[in-house]
Amino acid sequence: MGNLAQIAKAMGHEVFGCDNKVYPPMSDELNSSGINFFQGYEEKNIVDADIYVIGNAISKENNLLKEILRLEKKVVSGPEWLYQNILSNKKVIAVSGTHGKTTVTSMIAHALINNNFDPNYLIAGIPKKLEKSWNISNDEVFVIEADEYDTCYFDKRPKFFHYRPNILLINNIEFDHADIYENIEMIEKNFFELIKTMPSKSKVLINEKKVSKSFRNKLKKEKLKTTLQFLSLNTSNIHEENKLLAAHAIEDLISKEKVLNGLKDYIGVKRRFETIFNNKNFKLIDDFAHHPTAIEETIKMIREQTDNLTLIVELGSNSMKRGVHDKRLVDIFKNQETYTINASAEQEKIFSVHAKELTNDDIVKICSKDEKKKTILMCGNRNFHGFQKLILNQLNK
């Protein structure tokens, strides 16, 4: 929503915002964009506006929203506003899937820029080489992450329905978002319905090995207007796979060779396999992984370099907190020294043989020098409850 506010400001709108808490770097970005915002949803924070764009974290019980509705003001969801004001006039390349959306979206934007395009883009992360997470231009292309999470309190469809993509890239489909989905079939159904709505002259690219056979077969049997293309990517390296996906997504614009050349100076996105400390004794990596598959892929990349690994996983996502991934996590945790953050009492019992809940005392042990350089991997989509800062302080002693 912060990026959307900045886009609206760049288009010339007067923009105000409100959130429960606003932290850096977003608070800094909003201030530098000249966007005034309030913290807290008290009724007094209402600002007279022509339209109120409502984020999907806002429930209909929100006090400020209640006041907006009482005053009979016009409300719209973020994805709906984006389509009505921008996407309806663009060629939309939508990057979807359980994992890798931010990385692949940023790769596409990066490759286009390095090949003299000025693409519109909206990325749910902070690319290290690009100036910001969004861009608005006169270019016909708009690259966007296509999230399967719900849109708004009054629209429980996935956000991606609003984007009406010309090119849809499906990187992978796994079970996630256990707070709104009961099983993977419900998620697949939404992807299937999205594909059915896509018109002729559109295209769907699917990473073949990362979706279920039943989903593939169902699509193959359906009479679709769109062109369906299953991608067989001959690599086991997740970084190389993401680059190939990016190349396929924009193959109508530039050649694969030019895309790969354009990605030679790509250095990633903040909080995606980001090294935040490195010396002769320790490397600390921060990663947004909050699903077992993403954690496994991240560990695999580290294992190619070292076997001296300490894993710290924050159980912060809705699916993690609900315990739907506990069995897979046990299999992951047993392969290295592992600590958890925010595990429930029941999860602590389940993980007790292979992992323990992180404490301040453990940090001293983790940050003790070994004969061999140690890599500490912290995975999660929250803030690690302050433990990351404590580890950094200990490593810097």
Q: Which residues does each PLM region occupy?
A:
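Short, well-ordered alpha-helical microsegments
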Residues: M1, E61-N62, Y83, L130, ...
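ATP-dependent carboxylate-amine ligase
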Residues: M1-V22, N31-F37, D48-Y52, I68-K73, ...
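Phosphate-binding loop of NTP-binding sites
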Residues: I7-H13, N31, K44-V47, N56, ...
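Short, polar loop motifs at secondary-structure junctions
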Residues: N20-Y23, Y41-E43, N56-K60, E80, ...
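Short, glycine/acidic-enriched loop or turn micro-motifs at the edges of active sites
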Residues: V22, E148-D150, E174-F175, K210, ...
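Short loop/edge segments at beta-strand edges and connector loops
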Residues: Q39-Y41, S77-P79, I123-G125, I206-E208, ...
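Acidic, glycine-rich loop-and-beta core segments that form the ion-binding/anion-interacting portion
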Residues: N242
